[in-house]
């Protein structure tokens, strides 16, 4: 053994080829500080051996290296620029040491080689992947750029255009796609991986392969004619801006770094990367996106723990077909859990099956599935007009019309047919779970399971704990949601649960602006372009449906009359009463037609303005700051109330609920990250300016105390 540490082992194989194996404790290899220090020491030990002729890098895990240890980032990035620069330079010195070894090097890649893992393989002369390998530089998804030489080496290995696409999108690349562009030199079967890598090194030692020329290319400026370079970088900037926009600076910074470094050798090029990396690491966007990554890991970790308490879910049922039931059935069946789809009407069953078939056909058309897989998934969905097939289900999801009496009746009925230990969940967006439980004989085996529409696209599921829901029930539904490929958060029962409870104060702020003559299209523009929502409030209400919004608003007003009760009609009432229901009937705040691709197309409709003018008088202009304040303050305060009341367990879960359930702008990180970035004291001062507008704008005592102590919701 040449070198051994808890994360890396180096041994000498036959023919004086050394093997460096990444094999950290735990399930995966990460590039944390310990591994980086071990790699540095291992390379020093290797350099001291006079007989080594080549080096192969391998992994003792099912995957190569998944990337840096992102849990270290927020603390590290809070350091002074000088400290951060020192860390980046020290890390890069290790990668340079690997690249500069006086003999050929190769990486044997299996599973993920992402971020720092990808930058490791780029520092070697040869890269051999097995068929399971996925390679990529996902750093821009965290608001930063590669910091261990990725922006320097990748363009010199696969060309500027390919490298810019890889880096700016942050997408993982399959082994065969990496081979096409030259990121890897060969793709082999998993069992042949190490042998193939060693053979390539033997050929290099025997001078059958010119490893020195390959290495020199990475150390030199990019070989790109001036005109071609100008066209390449100009095109990349245009494409990046159209996708990333102004709120996500990292992809554009990556293009600029590759462009500026194109004429430089390795040393100067790396300095350009270092400076851009440090600048981005200090941004609020990086803090927000890294926070989302960590919160996602936290939420998924909680779901994994819940799985230990969960009852196994081998079969399921959904009551109520149609679009929602069909979506739930598709999601369950496509992830491997057979499901019965029960309805009282054959046309509804047909609609549900057609919905599932449509989603599957789209996957086949995109090459993401095959007709055989599609048939298998459809065979996992059993349509039924009677309850009999439901009796074997481990979990039954009720998804009938959003009406308390109808739901209560269906829940009481199905309970008579299911097994003693079956779990029943209601897919409701607003109705109290504890109220619905009153119709059931076993309320402890009942909870809420709120899917978001469209089911196949929206990652969040709210699992609602009723007054009597048992821990096994909650754990089992959380585990089932995870098995369906969803991100579950557990919330306690209250009107609107968590997501809708915090959404409707936002709509109330919007209604308040319209009541004073605000222009809904102008408000949408500010909330989309400046704040960063995927849809402004008017457009979102049209998509949700003004009838749905009208009903949910009434539920919220009844549940929280002091804050959400209202006197007189608001804009939602005006649209609803004039049968303007949104996209579903072609007219809401906007008018809708169908474009050439069959998608809804929105247009300004003068009728909407006439109706609002008749109700609220002449239009009045509001500036962007006021629009943002008056819509967002109510949502933020209500989110804080949910945390204080224990409706949601942590800032992390609240923020993930907002990002995954509502599309809260990821670059802002969620309400609690946004509050911490803004400063709680600054927010309280802003809210106080609008406190005269009512309870939705009045901060809680706990918020005021936190502000006075200069506190924050996250501990950095």
UniProtKB/Swiss-Prot annotation:
The active site is at residue 450. Substrate binds at residues 296, 500, 660. GO terms for cellular component: fatty acid beta-oxidation multienzyme complex. Pathway: Lipid metabolism; fatty acid beta-oxidation. Keywords: Fatty acid metabolism, Isomerase, Lipid degradation, Lipid metabolism, Lyase, Multifunctional enzyme, NAD, Oxidoreductase. It comes from the Bacteria. Residues 1-189 are annotated as: Enoyl-CoA hydratase/isomerase. One of its GO terms (biological process) is fatty acid beta-oxidation. Residues 311-716 are annotated as: 3-hydroxyacyl-CoA dehydrogenase. The record marks 119, 139 as: Important for catalytic activity. One of its GO terms (molecular function) is enoyl-CoA hydratase activity. It catalyses: a (3S)-3-hydroxyacyl-CoA + NAD(+) = a 3-oxoacyl-CoA + NADH + H(+); a (3S)-3-hydroxyacyl-CoA = a (2E)-enoyl-CoA + H2O; a 4-saturated-(3S)-3-hydroxyacyl-CoA = a (3E)-enoyl-CoA + H2O; (3S)-3-hydroxybutanoyl-CoA = (3R)-3-hydroxybutanoyl-CoA. The keyword Chloroplast does not apply. In the N-terminal section; belongs to the enoyl-CoA hydratase/isomerase family. In the C-terminal section; belongs to the 3-hydroxyacyl-CoA dehydrogenase family. Involved in the aerobic and anaerobic degradation of long-chain fatty acids via beta-oxidation cycle. Catalyzes the formation of 3-oxoacyl-CoA from enoyl-CoA via L-3-hydroxyacyl-CoA. It can also use D-3-hydroxyacyl-CoA and cis-3-enoyl-CoA as substrate. Heterotetramer of two alpha chains (FadB) and two beta chains (FadA). This is Fatty acid oxidation complex subunit alpha. The gene is fadB.
């Amino acid at each position: 053994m040449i070198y051994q540490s808890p994360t890396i082992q180096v041994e000498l194989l036959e023919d004086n080829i050394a093997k460096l194996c990444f094999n950290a404790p735990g399930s995966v290899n990460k590039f944390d500080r310990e591994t980086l220090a071990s790699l540095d020491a291992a390379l020093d030990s290797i350099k001291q051996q006079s007989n080594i002729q080549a080096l192969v890098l391998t992994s003792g895990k099912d995957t190569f290296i998944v990337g840096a240890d992102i849990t270290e980032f927020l603390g590290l990035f809070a350091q002074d620029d000088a400290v951060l620069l020192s860390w980046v330079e020290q890390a890069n010195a290790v990668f340079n040491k690997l690249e500069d070894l006086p003999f050929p090097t190769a990486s044997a890649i299996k599973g993920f080689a992402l971020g720092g893992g990808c930058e490791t393989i780029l520092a070697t002369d040869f890269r051999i992947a097995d068929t399971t390998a996925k390679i990529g530089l996902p750093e821009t998804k965290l608001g930063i750029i590669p910091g261990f030489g990725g922006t320097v080496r990748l363009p010199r290995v696969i060309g500027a255009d390919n490298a810019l696409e890889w880096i700016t999108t942050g997408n993982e690349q399959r082994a065969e796609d990496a081979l096409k562009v030259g990121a890897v030199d060969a793709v082999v079967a998993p069992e042949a991986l190490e042998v193939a890598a060693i053979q390539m090194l033997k050929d290099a030692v025997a001078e059958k392969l010119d490893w020195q020329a390959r290495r020199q290319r990475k150390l030199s400026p990019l070989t790109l004619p001036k005109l071609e370079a100008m066209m390449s970088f100009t095109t990349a900037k245009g494409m990046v801006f159209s996708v990333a926009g102004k709120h996500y600076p990292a992809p554009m910074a990556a293009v600029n770094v590759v462009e500026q470094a194109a004429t430089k050798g390795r040393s100067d090029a790396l300095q350009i990367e270092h400076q851009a990396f440090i600048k981005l690491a200090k941004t609020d966007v990086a803090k927000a996106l890294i926070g989302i990554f960590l919160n996602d890991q936290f939420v998924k970790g909680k779901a994994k723990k819940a799985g230990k308490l969960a009852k196994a879910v081998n079969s399921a049922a959904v009551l109520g077909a149609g679009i929602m039931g069909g979506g739930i059935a598709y999601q369950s069946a496509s992830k491997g859990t057979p499901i019965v789809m029960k309805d009282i009407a054959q046309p509804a069953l047909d609609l549900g099956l057609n919905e599932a078939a449509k989603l599957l056909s789209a996957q086949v058309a995109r090459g993401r599935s095959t007709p055989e897989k599609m048939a298998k998934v459809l065979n996992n969905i059993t349509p039924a007009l009677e309850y009999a097939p439901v009796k074997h289900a481990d979990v039954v999801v009720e998804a009938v019309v959003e009406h308390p009496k109808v739901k209560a009746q269906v829940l009481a009925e199905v309970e008579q047919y299911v097994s003693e230990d079956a779990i029943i969940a209601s897919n409701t967006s607003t109705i109290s779970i504890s109220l619905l439980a009153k119709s059931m004989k076993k309320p402890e085996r009942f909870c809420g399971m709120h899917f978001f529409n469209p089911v196949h696209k929206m990652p969040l599921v709210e699992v609602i704990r009723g007054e009597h829901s048992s821990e096994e029930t909650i754990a089992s539904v959380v585990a089932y949601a995870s098995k369906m490929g969803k991100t579950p958060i557990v919330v306690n029962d209250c009107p609107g649960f968590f997501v809708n409870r915090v959404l409707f104060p936002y709509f109330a702020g919007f209604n308040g602006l319209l009541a004073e003559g605000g222009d809904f299209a102008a408000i949408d523009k500010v909330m989309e372009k400046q704040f960063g929502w995927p849809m402004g409030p008017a457009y979102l209400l049209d998509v949700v449906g003004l009838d749905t919004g009208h009903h949910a608003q009434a539920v919220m007003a009844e549940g929280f009359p002091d804050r959400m009760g209202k006197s007189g009609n608001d804009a939602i009432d005006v649209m609803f009463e004039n049968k303007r229901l949104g996209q579903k009937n072609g007219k809401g705040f906007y008018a809708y037609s169908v474009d050439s691709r069959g998608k809804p197309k929105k247009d300004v409709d003068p009728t909407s303005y006439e109706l609002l003018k008749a109700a609220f008088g002449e239009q009045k202009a509001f500036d962007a700051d006021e629009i943002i304040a008056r819509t967002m303050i109510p949502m933020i305060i209500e989110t804080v109330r949910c945390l204080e009341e224990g409706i949601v367990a942590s800032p992390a879960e609240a923020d993930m609920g907002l990002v995954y359930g509502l599309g809260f702008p990821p670059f802002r990180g969620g309400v609690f990250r946004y509050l911490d970035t803004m400063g709680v004291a600054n927010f309280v001062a802003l809210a106080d300016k609008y406190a005269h507008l009512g309870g939705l704008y009045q901060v809680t005592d706990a918020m005021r105390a936190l502000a006075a102590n200069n506190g924050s919701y996250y501990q950095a």
